[in-house]
């Protein structure tokens, strides 16, 4: 092993990898998108399809990316270049590397919104925040959004500056158990409300009558984005994984963790909405309106609304922070590997990039609302469309091609089974990566772009 590989940062244990990777996967999408899609596309049948895709498609992609990272001990650019110097390898690596650099600024803007609402509930603004006008006025105020964006950004980069073991691993090990406890407490509170059982039944019990093609497409897209696939994160974190750890067992724990939080989010939100709306799931809206308008209205109508609001936004804050940390680490790792910069210099440069691009997003609903791109998209929406709908599916397709055409499925299997580690679902991996994963990724790319262009509606 080269001296460069010996010096590379590593997670100290399997738990460190699992909680850090789970922290990257458990994010805002689990809380503001999964419950909405589950409610819209059949409840229990959506959940069943989602679980099947997680055990096949999701499993295959996180195994592939983690194995590529560990076998090369490189961030995405170096990992792809390890297998060839052709321009296609460079392009595949750089697409994976650029994605987190573009996502983390606007993601941190939304993280700042979460900080603002958490602070608001702590201050006791429960009634004021239960109005759509409160949210609209806040995101339209450039000074306030920029302030909270910078607060969140500094928190993220402070953890990154501390390093892998002393920063990311310690923070994830502290935050993720608390996140689970909060999710369980809020779910118990939601499902014990009068009238909540109808929502629980709708969410958990499959009804084949609710099945449609869009159930599969929406579940596929949600699973893809939820697991941090094609963001460079799993390749980077895989490169920090010790050689004696089982890739299959570790990534399976990440799958379970991410799915459990998504299910708890569904139990937390869907029954509460059923109670609030007298059994009408159509009031659920995806994205910011669910988290910053609908949920505050529900909290205001509940007993102990202020306490529930604090717990909910603390949960969302932990989810947003751990995901942003993972995105930032992937970017910093690329700077260190490709430009040979120190962690300090890489962190400072990322700070400058985040402030520049994040400010565009922070002001996109206020002072810069007159500037739109493509289909009248504000900056934040455009960055989200570019990365999630276009670049990530392309990056995932590049990973499939790299594994099948260059490394070979047996090459990945050899890495997974290093030191006699298990690879129990090897047959599933081989079939999925060769045949179904590229097909699924193509569907995600088409449906994502078509959805934004208005050809189909989610």
Question: What do these predicted ranges mean?
Answer:
Residues 1-32, 61-66, 70-83, 87-94, ...:
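Membrane-interface "cap" regions at the ends of multi-pass membrane proteins
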Residues 2-4, 78, 111-140, 241-244, ...:
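Helix-loop-helix connectors at the membrane interface of multi-pass transporters/channels
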Residues 2-7, 11, 15, 169, ...:
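Membrane-embedded translocation segments of transport machinery
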Residues 5-8, 37-41, 76-95, 108-167, ...:
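Inter-helical loop and helix-membrane interface segments of multi-pass membrane transporters/permeases
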Residues 10, 16-17, 24, 142-147, ...:
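Loop-to-transmembrane helix boundary motifs in multi-pass membrane proteins
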Residues 13-53, 238, 249-252, 256-259, ...:
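Transmembrane helix-boundary motif of multi-pass solute transporters/channels
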Residues 38-64, 144, 391-395:
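Extracellular loop-to-transmembrane helix junctions
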Residues 91-97, 340-351, 384-441:
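C-terminal membrane-solvent junction of multi-pass transporters and transport-like membrane proteins
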